[in-house]
């Protein structure tokens, strides 16, 4: 709602039951969502489809790139989930990320575009005929609840951690600057 353009590319392998949420996100005028190498069939038939066409569906995308304005990119092993960002009270994955700027960010953007524009990257809406789309109202309500929960969790966090600019300024001197080269596989 702030005019920011968002493109979200997700691998389809472990996303059963989330199509309503994805379509709801994709319905926002500034958000585009694509699935990489989708299984085709949705619901219970998805698993059977995978078993029958395993060679085709074994080609997955494991890239993680968070790119802002083509100027800075965060890359690493984190998936999208509370447990990857210290927000899950019962489980927390420890992972490493790298922040790249300049030419490295440009290369990260090119890598993202390579996968975004690949024939295996499919807009979520293309998986459903107009008459068979999931109900987006319930998904929208679920997103509102999730956003409210996130606000509550973040409000409990240390105020310094929420002030990103101050945090970046305070950690700038401890960053390690090095040359970069972004390498990805082919889509």
Predicted segments, located by residue:
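Charged, low-complexity intrinsically disordered terminal segments
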Residues: 1-64, 68-187
């Amino acid at each position: 709602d702030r005019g920011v353009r968002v493109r979200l590319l997700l691998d389809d392998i472990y996303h059963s039951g989330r199509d309503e949420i994805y379509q709801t996100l994709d319905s926002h005028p500034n958000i585009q969502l694509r699935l990489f190498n989708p299984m085709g069939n949705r619901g219970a038939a998805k698993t059977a489809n995978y078993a029958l066409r395993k060679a085709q569906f074994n080609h997955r995308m494991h890239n993680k790139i968070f790119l802002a304005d083509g100027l800075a990119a965060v890359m690493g092993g984190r998936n999208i989930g509370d447990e990857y960002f210290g927000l899950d009270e019962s489980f927390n994955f420890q992972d490493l990320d790298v922040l790249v700027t300049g030419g490295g960010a440009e290369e990260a953007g090119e890598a993202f575009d390579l996968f975004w524009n690949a024939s295996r990257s499919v807009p979520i809406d293309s998986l459903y005929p107009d008459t068979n789309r999931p109900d987006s109202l319930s998904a929208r309500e679920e997103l509102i609840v999730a956003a409210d929960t996130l606000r509550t969790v973040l409000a409990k966090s240390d105020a310094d951690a929420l002030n990103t600019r101050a945090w970046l300024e305070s950690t700038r001197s401890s960053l390690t600057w090095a040359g970069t080269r972004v390498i990805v596989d082919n889509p």
